Amino acid sequence: MEEAKIPMLKLGPITFNLTLLAVCIVTIAVIFAFVFWASRQMKLKPEGKQTALEYLISFVDGIGEEHLDHNLQKSYSLLLFTIFLFVAVANNLGLFTKLETVNGYNLWTSPTANLAFDLALSLFITLMVHIEGVRRRGLVAHLKRLATPWPMTPMNLLEEFTNFLSLAIRLFGNIFAGEVVTGLIVQLANYRVYWWPIAFLVNMAWTAFSVFISCIQAFVFTKLTATYLGKKVNESEE
């Protein structure tokens, strides 16, 4: 299977992946459109789209309640909800269509199937939880935790690095593998006409399974974010 080319834009020393930028914008637009649509004409007794939105909010709030102190959970509920929606939509975006130019340039993919994107997202989470730790507990107390007990300081620092790395690689591995298998199934239909029905059925089953896995990965990513955040800001961690 021939590897698709990626359209790039080079500005000075920085090279931009145009496909990745485009699908990130689409991801944000989809999330905004869904929340805007679901939050219109809200009623005291929720129904339909409002029920779906409130269920999602309650579901993500439940994640925060497990790992954050009660007095802090509401402060981070919107952040966790945004992370969950963003990762869930980004994971599934590349499963349902494939866009390529006649020159072989790939114009559509899941943002989270790109390792650089996942590393950047993981770096944002890592920096955010440390900044919140300093803001909530103070710089001295935050650094003290990393050096307690002091003989374990190197291991504590290594743990922070592995948390950052595993958060990105876990997400990338699952989503990238899903897109690769989907591509292989689609290629199956190109060999013989009589393979089309089989490829179609297998692709439908695999796509449904991939959607499930993508949502699970969004849940895991959000849960780990709440876990790391709780370790830095909870008073019980003093």
From Swiss-Prot:
Membrane topology term: Multi-pass membrane protein
GO biological process, alphabetically ordered: proton motive force-driven plasma membrane ATP synthesis
Principal location class: membrane
One Gene Ontology CC term in the entry: plasma membrane
Gene3D superfamilies: ATP synthase, F0 complex, subunit A (1.20.120.220)
Keyword Lipid metabolism: no
GO-annotated molecular function: proton-transporting ATP synthase activity, rotational mechanism
Record field: transmembrane: 18-38, 76-96, 114-134, 166-186, 193-213
Protein localization: Cell membrane
Quaternary organization: F-type ATPases have 2 components, CF(1) - the catalytic core - and CF(0) - the membrane proton channel. CF(1) has five subunits: alpha(3), beta(3), gamma(1), delta(1), epsilon(1). CF(0) has three main subunits: a(1), b(2) and c(9-12). The alpha and beta chains form an alternating ring which encloses part of the gamma chain. CF(1) is attached to CF(0) by a central stalk formed by the gamma and epsilon chains, while a peripheral stalk is formed by the delta and b chains.
Family membership noted in the UniProt record: Belongs to the ATPase A chain family.
HAMAP family tied to this protein: ATP_synth_a_bact
Protein name listed in UniProt: ATP synthase subunit a
Taxonomic source organism: Streptococcus pyogenes serotype M49 (strain NZ131)
